[in-house]
Amino acid sequence: MAELACFCYPHLENDSYKFIPFNNLAIKCMLTAKVDRKDQDKFYNSIIYGIAPPPQFKKRYNTNDNSRGMNYETSMFNKVAVLICEALNSIKVTQSDVANVLSRVVSVRHLENLVLRRENHQDVLFHSKELLLKSVLIAIGHSKEIETTATAEGGEIVFQNAAFTMWKLTYLEHKLMPILDQNFIEYKITVNEDKPISESHVKELIAELRWQYNKFAVITHGKGHYRVVKYSSVANHADRVYATFKSNNKNGNVLEFNLLDQRIIWQNWYAFTSSMKQGNTLDICKKLLFQKMKRESNPFKGLSTDRKMDEVSQIGI
């Protein structure tokens, strides 16, 4: 995760702003600079290489002292920064909006995936600039539309029906902020269209999840799509979701947290996010993740549980 101010800076033209991507030499200069505390939140002028991000965001970049940040010296950083600028320059951002826009925390991996989709000649985003920009504006939280299959970050499709598409995420192969844990495995489910979904299509998805992904929890980050994650990583997701929710509220980026379909979401996660929306502390909310929940009656009585052992997934074992 990183703020948009880590990728670009605003330049006033007439009554609105144009956004310009940082170059990696300017960032490198900022990372070595001694800056007064009162200037930590201001864009840094490297003199030689142009404007750099505010020094308060130093920890967002990978250095000898911080291996958890972005690999800003890769070509992928420049591609992501350019893509963000293209999207921001397609809309009007005024002086009253610019600080709010640049403070938005975005998923770096999501944006890298959109770059990969853009470069794939077989992908619809390669052929449609309008759909590409729409996808980016959704990813950076500017659009109130949800991420559907056409505007999704992408990955490897492992399941699809008339209503849903399930993607295996490819973060292990990323350049900008790869996941280093080789045991990482995670999926995302997007709706094909933002419209009411028939019970039969929900039933098909639940059957697929029950038999092929029975070692995983289905959760949501509140953005209109589902995530299918290992139970061992649920607490980590909870910390991130709670921190983002609080940060957005603090910065005035109040986005509706979408709880999604309770029949699909893991019961404990639904309880956690509901408690979070009510304003409870992180500790109170997280207790619900480890609490034994009363099993609800099967919402789909026709969904058979009669399967042979060799049909049950071994994924995640």
Curated annotation (Swiss-Prot):
GO biological process: viral genome replication
Location within or outside the cell: Host cytoplasm
Single Gene Ontology MF annotation: metal ion binding
Cofactor requirement: Mg(2+)
Record flagged with keyword Protein biosynthesis: no
UniProt enzyme class: hydrolase
Superkingdom of the organism of origin: Viruses
Enzyme Commission identifier(s): 3.6.4.-
Positions with a binding annotation for ATP: 107-109, 188, 221-223, 227
InterPro entries found in the cross-reference section: Rota_NS35_C, Rota_NS35_N, Rotavirus_NSP2, Rotavirus_NSP2_C, Rotavirus_NSP2_N
Region named RNA-binding: 205-241
This protein's record includes keyword ATP-binding: yes
One Pfam family recorded for the sequence: Rota_NS35_N
Record keywords: ATP-binding, Host cytoplasm, Hydrolase, Magnesium, Metal-binding, Nucleotide-binding, RNA-binding
Active site (catalytic residues): 225
A GO cellular-component term linked to this record: host cell cytoplasm
Similarity comment: family membership: Belongs to the rotavirus NSP2 family.
Quaternary structure note: Homooctamer. Interacts with VP1; this interaction is weak. Interacts with NSP5; this interaction leads to up-regulation of NSP5 phosphorylation and formation of viral factories. Interacts with host DCP1A, DCP1B, DDX6, EDC4 and EIF2S1/eIF2-alpha; these interactions are probably part of the sequestration of some host SGs and PBs proteins in viral factories.
Function: Participates in replication and packaging of the viral genome. Plays a crucial role, together with NSP5, in the formation of virus factories (viroplasms), which are large inclusions in the host cytoplasm where replication intermediates are assembled and viral RNA replication takes place. Displays ssRNA binding, NTPase, RNA triphosphatase (RTPase) and ATP-independent helix-unwinding activities. The unwinding activity may prepare and organize plus-strand RNAs for packaging and replication by removing interfering secondary structures.
Protein name: Non-structural protein 2
Taxonomic source organism: Rotavirus A (strain RVA/Cow/United Kingdom/UK/1975/G6P7[5])
Origin organism lineage: Viruses, Riboviria, Orthornavirae, Duplornaviricota, Resentoviricetes
